[in-house]
Swiss-Prot record:
Enzyme class label: isomerase
Gene expressing this chain: hisA
UniProt-listed Enzyme Commission number(s): 5.3.1.16
Intrachain disulfide bonds: none
Organism ancestry: Bacteria, Bacillati, Cyanobacteriota, Cyanophyceae, Acaryochloridales
Coarse class of the protein's main subcellular location: cytoplasm
Annotated CDD domains: HisA
Molecular function GO terms recorded: 1-(5-phosphoribosyl)-5-[(5-phosphoribosylamino)methylideneamino]imidazole-4-carboxamide isomerase activity
Pathway in which the depicted protein is active: Amino-acid biosynthesis; L-histidine biosynthesis; L-histidine from 5-phospho-alpha-D-ribose 1-diphosphate: step 4/9
Organism: Acaryochloris marina (strain MBIC 11017)
Protein name listed in UniProt: 1-(5-phosphoribosyl)-5-[(5-phosphoribosylamino)methylideneamino] imidazole-4-carboxamide isomerase
Length: 257
């Protein structure tokens, strides 16, 4: 299973939000490029970048920083935040970004998502961010009545390469991922699901690993890496390619609820 470190960009700095609240941001570094290089050095196979300013304004804002990160790394980078039209997606991919993550536009213009998936096969991922199972949009500032699983099914039809599912109420909280929701989504669709939000420990990753067989192929980890609750190198040894353990993960009530 992929363990993907996350860098959230706000005003050019590396930050973490609490439950998606821009007023509860914590700065972890003034130099996102150095942070990205550190994750690569520790064995990351992907990097997840979110332009929080872009998510809020509707167009990418931290382009210079994104370009610098992509140029500094050898591993592929996926980027989300403010990608709501073809020009913005093309602009990012031309910078060398491997995958663009579409969010709000999946609700507001699903036809465009389908067109982009056809134009850029395997490079378009849909990020579904949800509160209590319902999709949030526009930088998590608005919540729709659309169910996350229903949107995921539509995006499979559109041609998305994968779904990144973020449970907003767990994001930045270190409370553990929403295992039941991830299981429901993975069982409902035929493309990979990447978990995001709440991962706080190796145990959480092992519980996600139990879902790998049904399609949960990766976990995006943010705050727990910055607080050192998780060491990336240890996480990769535990659940990544060539993992050291073949012991079944904890399948207690938290995993099977």
């Amino acid at each position: 299973m992929d363990v993907i470190p996350a860098i959230d960009l706000l005003e050019g700095r590396c930050v973490r939000l609490y439950q998606g609240d821009y007023d509860q941001s914590q700065v972890f570094s003034e130099n996102p490029v150095e942070v990205a290089k550190a994750w690569e050095a520790q064995g990351a196979q992907w990097l997840h970048l979110v332009d929080l300013d872009g998510a809020k304004t509707g167009q990418p804002v931290n382009l210079d920083t994104i370009a610098a990160v992509v140029e500094a790394l050898e591993i592929p980078v996926q980027v989300g935040g403010g990608l709501r039209d073809r020009n913005r997606v093309t602009q990012l991919l031309n910078l060398g970004v491997r995958r663009g993550i579409l969010g709000t536009v999946a609700i507001e213009n699903p036809d465009l998502v389908q067109e982009l998936c056809q134009e850029f096969p395997d490079q378009i991922v849909v990020g579904i961010d949800a509160r209590e199972g319902r999709v949030a949009t526009r930088g998590w500032l608005e919540t729709s009545e659309i169910l996350a699983v229903d949107l995921a099914k539509r995006m499979v039809t559109a041609g998305a390469a994968a779904i990144i599912y973020t449970d907003i109420q767990r994001d930045g909280t270190l409370q553990g991922p929403n295992i039941p929701m991830l299981r429901e989504m993975a069982e409902a669709i035929t493309i990979p699901v990447i978990a995001s939000g709440g991962v706080s420990s190796i145990t959480d990753l092992l519980n996600l690993l139990a879902l790998e067989a049904i399609g949960v192929t990766g976990a995006i980890v943010g705050k727990a890496l910055y607080t050192e609750d998780i060491a990336l190198s240890e996480a990769l040894r535990a659940v990544g390619p060539g993992r050291w353990q073949d012991v079944p993960p904890d399948l207690g009530s938290s995993a099977l609820a």
